[in-house]
A protein has these predicted regions:
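Active-site proximal loops enriched in glycine and acidic residues that flank catalytic Cys/His/Asp
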Residues: 17, 49, 72, 82, ...
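Single conserved hydrophobic/aromatic residue that forms the stacking wall/gate
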Residues: 179-187
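Solvent-exposed, polar/charged alpha-helical surfaces in well-ordered, non-transmembrane soluble domains
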Residues: 33-36, 69, 124, 128, ...
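Substrate-binding/access-modulating region of protease and related hydrolase catalytic domains
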Residues: 1-65, 87-88, 105-120, 158
Length: 187
């Protein structure tokens, strides 16, 4: 990915996989280190929250990384939920994740799938459109804009920022900005 980033100017990485909760800690740490390095290189990393919810602390690696954008499904009860072990609110953003039409090598080439791996490309695609419009944006700026444009869900303010709102994200609807401080819910 590092080589392709330089060669093709890759700006975004969709990571629709997660490590199983019982995976070795060293394996999890290696992927977290790589994901954080990619973010620091200027690649917006968008990762699935995993499908081990709905209980707390159920977001999978790499979605627990403080730096990256973690996506949950607002219409799938299995969607991973935070906080993380470091008390970070995760996932940050939600998108549709149930009965999404996807590709298959059977059933005439299509199948309906559900989970955060289906929600994550929706957010990654919205961010790709944003980066097409504003190609100089840094990952932190993308995350701030996402934070300021999500459709808030008052009943879930301690669990996420809200649902991705593509019109607001792209500036089609005006937005007021606030400073981003990653919320925590632990004392």
């Amino acid at each position: 990915i590092r080589d392709s980033h330089k060669k093709y100017d890759i700006k975004i990485l969709n990571f629709s996989v997660g490590y199983l909760p019982d995976s070795k800690l060293t394996e999890k740490q290696k992927i977290l280190d790589v994901i954080d390095e990619l973010w620091d290189l200027g690649i917006v990393v968008v990762a699935a929250a995993g499908n081990y919810g709905p209980g707390p602390f159920s977001v999978t690696v790499p979605g627990i990384s403080r730096k990256i954008i973690t996506v949950g499904s607002y219409d799938d009860f299995r969607s991973g939920r935070g906080p993380t072990g470091c008390c970070i609110v995760k996932p940050e953003v939600l998108a549709p994740g149930s009965e999404i039409l996807s590709l298959s090598n059977r059933n005439n080439g299509f199948v309906r799938k559900s989970g955060t791996s289906m929600a994550t490309p929706i957010v990654a695609g919205a961010i790709a459109l944003l980066l097409e419009r504003y190609p100089k944006m840094k990952p932190e700026e993308v995350k701030l804009r996402l934070y300021n444009t999500c459709k808030r869900i008052p009943s879930q303010k301690d669990r996420n920022w809200g649902i991705v709102d593509v019109d607001k994200l792209l500036g089609i609807i005006s937005v007021s900005y606030t400073h981003l401080t990653l919320p925590t819910i632990c004392s």
